Swiss-Prot record:
Pathway: Amino-acid biosynthesis; L-arginine biosynthesis; L-arginine from L-ornithine and carbamoyl phosphate: step 3/3. This is Argininosuccinate lyase. One of its GO terms (biological process) is arginine biosynthetic process via ornithine. Pfam families: ASL_C2, Lyase_1. GO terms for molecular function: argininosuccinate lyase activity. Keywords: Amino-acid biosynthesis, Arginine biosynthesis, Cytoplasm, Lyase. GO terms for cellular component: cytosol. Its EC number is 4.3.2.1. It is an enzyme of class 4 (lyase). InterPro entries: Arg_succ_lyase_C (IPR029419), Argininosuccinate_lyase (IPR009049), Fumarase/histidase_N (IPR024083), Fumarate_lyase_fam (IPR000362), Fumarate_lyase_N (IPR022761), L-Aspartase-like (IPR008948).
Length: 481
């Protein structure tokens, strides 16, 4: 029987009720964190002379044994509700209630689970950041390799202006940079301690909340006990960051799918990330990119579900909060898997430089620079130049002739003169790109500068990540060994 029910509640729980209410399926994510929390709390109880050193050391020794054998070695009886009671029941079985039953003094499962979630989530966030840094490094290498590879950029999915493929890759690096920063920002709000808040009103025991905060490597305390046990905003913030990252990554998937079609044919996805058809032998389908695109969409649903669960809950702890965790962990599983797949696809793509250049040379992608050249060389207003070049494009399309064959006549009709050299330069995609060397532009030298700038940022991210990981490792080493 559940050790919690024998007092106030006389009867045992029906089996279907047990299965309905247990959280053990996803408690695997907080198993080690719960043991860390137990050890830190017990250590503090001994130091405060609330629990004897003799009893406390026995509890800690047994907790370390449980950590080594793992969760699957325990009696995962759903009648025990959750991993907290599974571990406590195991301790009581080994040490007796007079010893093990003292571990929970001055604590509630409410502040315990709130602490466990933060301990586990901070590690997941760092795992995500590590994968993003690795992916960013691979993307920067690709961008540098293609700093001079001419391609065409799109607006409204219509050809717009020539750019470099390196510049296009850096657009995704730039988004990932912001994602990394968001996760680091969220980490500061995840890594705060609710331990000691009790059920919702702290405790009458002389506990030392700052001591457990230090033992567990938290930055600071959540001081208000009611907020401490009820706050799950750190989960919402993390899931929102994951959803935003998922949206950014879905753009990469979409570009891989689109640009690998025969109509674009500018990139080819490696065979290991594709499939073929059961009936059409010629097919090379971008299955991994498509599945990633779909999986990334589920992140938004998980976020909205959690927000809906939390909306208008009475203050402090409610069991509804238990149903948040599965959606949180599912989102972390999904984003981690998708980062790995997308990094693999981007790192192994074949780039068709000839096709990219061919696309950039047709369909009037250089029209903007032609208008700009008129402004610079003929000293006319841009809006006037815009109209003249627009007329030139329309005439070219309607009469099915090349711009170069009619350009002089159109300019002459508008009282303008431009040398052949200037015209050829304006219509050359590479010359177009070279001119756009302002900060953030697609010019090769600006792409190379941006790559170095992003690498410097990446080094700072790596240092920040390593510092945080070492801090967590030190906590685990201190408490578990």
């Amino acid at each position: 029987m559940n050790i919690l029910r024998r007092g106030r509640l006389g009867s045992s729980v029906k089996e279907d009720v047990m299965k309905f209410t247990t959280s053990l399926e996803f408690d695997k994510e907080i198993f080690q964190s719960d043991i860390l929390c137990d050890i830190a709390h017990t250590t503090m109880l001994m130091e405060q002379k609330i629990v004897s050193i003799e009893f406390g050391e026995k509890v800690i020794e047994e907790l370390k044994k449980i950590a080594k054998v793992g969760m699957d070695s325990l009696n995962l009886d759903p009648s025990l509700d959750d991993i907290h009671m599974v571990i406590e029941s195991e301790l009581i079985k080994k040490l007796g209630e007079d010893v093990a039953g003292r571990m929970h003094t001055g604590r509630s499962r409410n502040d315990e689970v709130a602490t466990d979630l933060r301990l586990s989530l901070r590690k997941k966030v760092l795992e995500i950041v590590k994968l993003l840094i690795d992916m960013e490094e691979n993307m920067l290498s690709l961008a540098k390799e293609h700093s001079e590879t001419i391609t065409v950029g799109y607006t409204h999915l219509q050809q717009a202006q020539p750019v470099t493929f390196g510049h296009q890759i850096l657009s995704h690096v730039s988004a990932v940079e912001r994602d990394i920063s968001r996760f680091f920002d969220a980490y500061n709000r995840i890594n705060i301690s609710p331990l000691g808040c009790g059920a919702m009103a702290t405790t009458g025991f002389n506990i030392d909340r700052k001591r457990t905060m230090e033992l567990l490597g938290f930055y600071e305390l959540i001081e208000n006990s009611m907020d401490g046990v009820s706050s799950r905003d750190f989960i919402v913030e993390t899931m929102a960051n994951i959803s935003m990252l998922g949206t950014n990554l879905s753009k990469i998937c979409e570009e891989l799918i689109l640009f690998s079609t025969a109509e674009f044919k500018t990139v080819e996805i490696a065979d290991e990330y594709t499939s073929t058809s059961s009936i059409m032998p010629q097919k090379k389908n971008p299955d991994v990119a498509e599945i990633a695109r779909a999986k990334l969409s589920t992140l938004n649903g998980n976020l909205i579900t959690v927000l809906t669960i939390m909306k208008a809950l009475p203050n402090t702890y409610n069991r509804d909060l238990q149903e948040i965790s599965p959606h949180l962990w599912k989102s972390t599983y999904t984003i981690i898997d998708c980062i790995k797949m997308i990094d693999g696809m981007v790192s192994t793509i074949k780039v068709n430089k000839e096709r990219m250049k061919e696309n950039a040379e047709k369909n009037y992608a250089t029209a903007t620079e032609l208008a700009d050249t008129l402004v610079r060389e003929c000293n006319i207003a841009f809006r006037m130049a815009h109209g003249i070049v627009g007329e030139l494009v329309r005439t070219s399309i309607e009469e099915k002739v090349e711009i170069k064959d009619i350009i002089l006549d159109v300019f002459k009709a508008n009282g303008l003169h431009l040398s052949k050299e200037k015209i050829d330069s304006a219509l050359d995609p590479y010359e177009n790109v070279k001119l756009r060397d302002v900060i953030g532009g697609p010019a090769p030298k600006e792409v190379e500068r941006a790559v170095l700038s992003f690498k410097n940022k990446m080094e700072l991210h790596s240092k920040n990540l390593n510092d945080k990981m070492r801090s967590i490792e030190a906590v685990e080493e201190n408490l578990l060994n």
